[in-house]
Every structure is written in structure tokens, then in C-alpha cells.
């Protein structure tokens, strides 16, 4: 009887882990670039939230003399 219970418990653990993995893999992130001449992280986060209805966030990065804001948000917005 204990062997059947062990096999059932292992099967249930694998099933639950498989269902959780399916839910976390479905969330894809999209990106958007806001080009600016100057950028700070607080302003960047605010701009991204305004543009994408409160979803996602942003961070600044610099390419040569141009600082830009890179927004990341769920693709289903």
C-alpha cells in the first residue's frame, strides 16, 4: 500500500509543478524605447507607466551622447 501512495504522491508533485510552469511561461515582456537627450531613472519609470497604463517599468541607458529610456511591459497590455 505504501508503494502505491508514494507513486501517487510523486505523480501529483510532477503534475502540480507542470501546471505552475505553464502559467509562468505565458508572460512575455515587450520593450519600447523613448529617446531623450537627458534621462533619470525616476522620470523614466514615470514615463513608461504613463505610456503603458501603469504596467511595467523603465530604466535609462546611454548610447554616445543620447540618453534613452527603455520601457519593459507585459505584451498583452
Swiss-Prot record:
Domain of life: Eukaryota
Signal peptide (UniProt feature, chain positions): 1-26
Pfam families, sorted: SLR1-BP
Disulphide connectivity of cysteines: 30-75, 39-60, 44-69, 48-71
Gene Ontology biological-process annotations: defense response to fungus; killing of cells of another organism
Entry GO terms, CC: extracellular region
Keywords: Antimicrobial, Disulfide bond, Fungicide, Plant defense, Secreted, Signal
Localization per Swiss-Prot or TrEMBL: Secreted
Principal localisation: secreted
InterPro entries: DEFL
Family to which this protein belongs: Belongs to the DEFL family.
Stated name of the protein: Putative defensin-like protein 120
Gene encoding the protein: LCR56
